[in-house]
């Protein structure tokens, strides 16, 4: 809760069944009213083009707005993404951890070149929690779009630095990948990340790479929003500290 607020300051079973035919040869299931859920998710999956990897600097997501207020400056691509999200999210206009897990794992099924054990529900709950500005346990449109853009950018970085095409990043590749994603880390923090997210051989698979960057991005943004005088120091109470560390 505290983390999410700090960041903003500076139909589950039916979906699962529909996703079964996504990216496969089977037909797509239609929900009542003619909604083609597979097509909706497919549109979201293909929303971000496969651009070349580039330097990425973490930025705060846009502040939460009323979902029906579509700014005139929005591109046609974003409008289409918003429409697809509306149908995917359902009446509450938010996507939960289970939906996110299904979407991410279906995306992974397209990329056989990425070594991964898949995104677990616990991992997706953690991802949702650091992005959840209103503590509903779900992601609204702006939050989801921000996350999705980052995942696609980081996927490009991951593939660029997997130079031996092993599907995972070794210790010699990981440091460069983190820097290309926009994170300059000291040796102590780098070693902590390796111990937390890599395997015993020091290799990191795709889902752990994304989980690591989501957390890094969120913590950098949280610190920046709390460091109001920009002196590189923050002061928090025990209550704020517990909220910051427990709901993430």
Swiss-Prot record:
Annotated Ca(2+) 1 binding sites: 89, 92, 94
Segments forming a coiled coil: none
Binding site for Ca(2+) 3: 162, 164, 166
Positions contributing to Ca(2+) 4 binding: 117, 205
InterPro entries cross-referenced by the UniProt entry: EF-hand-dom_pair, EF_hand_dom
Subunit structure of this chain's protein: Heterodimer of a large (catalytic) and a small (regulatory) subunit.
Keywords, comma-separated and alphabetical: Calcium, Cell membrane, Cytoplasm, Membrane, Metal-binding, Repeat
UniProt-recorded name of the protein: Calpain small subunit 2
CDD domains: EFh_PEF_CPNS1_2 (cd16188)
Cell compartments where the protein resides: Cytoplasm; Cell membrane
Native organism taxonomy: Eukaryota, Metazoa, Chordata, Craniata, Vertebrata
Species of the source: Homo sapiens (Human)
Highest taxon above the source species: Eukaryota
PROSITE patterns (alphabetical): EF_HAND_1, EF_HAND_2
Record function comment: Calcium-regulated non-lysosomal thiol-protease which catalyzes limited proteolysis of substrates involved in cytoskeletal remodeling and signal transduction. This small subunit may act as a tissue-specific chaperone of the large subunit, possibly by helping it fold into its correct conformation for activity.
């Amino acid at each position: 809760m505290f983390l999410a607020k700090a960041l903003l300051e500076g139909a589950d079973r039916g979906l699962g069944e529909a996703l079964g035919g996504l990216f496969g040869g089977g037909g797509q299931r239609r929900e009542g009213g003619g909604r083609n859920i597979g097509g909706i998710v497919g549109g979201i999956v293909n929303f971000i083009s496969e651009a070349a990897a580039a330097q990425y600097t973490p930025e705060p997501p846009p502040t939460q707005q009323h979902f029906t207020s579509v700014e005139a400056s929005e591109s046609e691509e974003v409008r289409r993404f918003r429409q697809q999200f509306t149908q995917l999210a359902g009446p509450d206009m938010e996507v939960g951890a289970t939906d996110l897990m299904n979407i991410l794992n279906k995306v992974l099924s397209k990329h056989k070149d990425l070594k991964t054990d898949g995104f677990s529900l616990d991992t997706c709950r953690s991802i949702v929690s650091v992005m959840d500005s209103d503590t509903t346990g779900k992601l609204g449109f702006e939050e989801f779009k921000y996350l999705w853009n980052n995942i696609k950018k980081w996927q490009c970085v991951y593939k660029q630095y997997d130079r031996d095409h092993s599907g995972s990043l070794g210790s010699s590749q990981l440091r460069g990948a983190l820097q290309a994603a926009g994170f300059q880390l000291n040796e102590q923090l780098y070693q902590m990340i390796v111990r937390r997210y890599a395997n015993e051989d020091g290799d990191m698979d795709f889902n752990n790479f994304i989980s690591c960057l989501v957390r890094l991005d969120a913590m950098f943004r949280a610190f920046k929003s709390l460091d109001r005088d920009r002196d590189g120091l923050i002061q928090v109470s025990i209550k704020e500290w517990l909220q910051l560390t427990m709901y993430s």
